[in-house]
Structure formats: structure tokens, C-alpha cells
Design a protein with these regions (language model features):
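N-terminal accessory/cap region of cofactor-dependent oxidoreductases and related radical enzymes
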Residues: 1-135
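A general alpha-helix detector
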Residues: 83-87, 151-158
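Inter-helical turn/loop segments and adjacent helix faces that build the functional surface
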Residues: 90-97, 156-168
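Amphipathic alpha-helical scaffolding segments
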Residues: 104-107, 149-154, 173
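Alpha-helix capping and helix-loop boundary segments enriched in small/acidic/polar residues
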Residues: 118, 139-147, 161-168
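Short, conserved phosphate-binding/catalytic loop or strand-edge motifs used
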Residues: 124-131, 146-155
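Non-catalytic regulatory/linker segments of enzymes
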Residues: 132-137, 154, 160-162
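Conserved small/polar residues in nucleotide/adenosyl-binding loops
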Residues: 171-177
Length: 177
């Protein structure tokens, strides 16, 4: 309406963030995501969907929501798999150490965020994929990493203890798996 345009033009209020951005001011439960992976959420959603009584009208919206969640999980898995494939293709033309790095990247991207993270590198990659996808979906609007230090520390500590990471965050390629 014209009266709304007057307020927007004068700067009294704006709709920019509401017209072109998704939900905001949120932090993903990365601790849970890293522990169970998207596959954990997928199993739970499939169970909830299977338990719905579709003769109850209120459950139709739930069914549609669960179906959408499963589509998103599959899309995220496909997105990560594309990075895995690209790293694999790049490794074909790479030399020695770089080839090893690219093959490791390919392995990590084929695993997370769909499966739970089991190393510091996997945890970082999992968080990055989810954060990136949310940024793309919501136009980069008010997304927080939350307490990155708290949910990443167990993975850092474990890799430090295994010798996979040195104190200066130098990765060793010959550490025990």
C-alpha cells in the first residue's frame, strides 16, 4: 500500500531483511550435528513420519514438513558429494603431497555432514558445510556459529592426543588412523 511506501521511503522502517532473507538470529546445535550427523536426524524424521496417523488432519502439515526435511538432508548430502567428486577429479592431476590432500578432502566430503564427525578436520568441514548452506539459503542473515570452542574442543583434543595435529595445528600425514 502507498502509506507503507511513504514510511519506507522516509526511513521510518525498512523491510530489507524481511523481504530477501530467511529466519535469523539462530545458532545450529552443532554439538548434536557432529555427534549424530544428518543421518541421525534422517532416522528420527523417518520414524516420526512413519508414526503419523494421516487420518488426523493436523498431521498432514507434519507429514509435509517431514518430507521437506528429508529432501533437504538429501540435498545437503548431494552438495557435499559434489565437493568430494571435485576433489577426487583434482587429485587425478595433482602431484604427491597435494594429491594426498585432495584425496583426504574427497573422503571427508563424502562422509560429513551426513555421517557423524570423527576427527577435527571432519568436524570443521561438517560445520562449514552447514553454515555455508544456511548462508546461501538465508542470504547470510544473522547466523551464529554458537560456542564453536566448546563443540569443537573434543575433536581437537582427540586429534592432539593421537598425534594427528601438533600443538601449532600442523597436521602430520603419517599419524595413526
Amino acid at each position: 500500500p502507498e502509506e507503507v511506501n511513504v514510511f519506507m521511503e522516509t526511513g521510518f522502517f525498512g523491510m530489507e531483511g524481511k523481504l530477501n532473507s530467511g529466519d535469523a538470529h539462530l545458532a545450529v546445535d552443532y554439538e548434536q550435528l557432529l555427534k549424530i550427523g544428518l543421518v541421525g536426524y534422517e532416522k528420527r524424521v523417518r520414524q516420526l513420519k512413519a508414526e503419523l496417523d494421516l487420518c488426523v488432519p493436523e498431521n498432514i502439515d507434519k507429514y509435509v514438513f517431514y518430507k521437506a526435511v528429508l529432501i533437504v538432508i538429501e540435498a545437503v548430502k548431494t552438495y557435499a558429494d559434489r565437493f568430494s567428486l571435485l576433489a577426487q577429479e583434482m587429485a587425478e592431476n595433482a602431484q604427491s603431497h597435494r594429491k594426498d590432500e585432495l584425496l583426504e578432502i574427497s573422503n571427508i566430503c563424502s562422509k560429513v555432514p551426513y555421517e557423524p564427525a570423527s576427527s577435527f578436520k571432519e568436524a570443521i568441514q561438517s560445520v562449514w558445510f552447514i553454515q555455508l548452506i544456511l548462508q546461501i539459503e538465508s542470504n547470510g542473515h544473522s547466523l551464529s556459529y554458537g560456542r564453536f570452542d566448546q563443540y569443537m574442543y573434543p575433536y581437537l583434543k582427540a586429534d592432539l592426543e593421537k598425534g594427528v595435529i601438533m600443538d601449532c595445528l600442523l597436521y602430520t600425514s603419517d599419524a595413526a588412523d
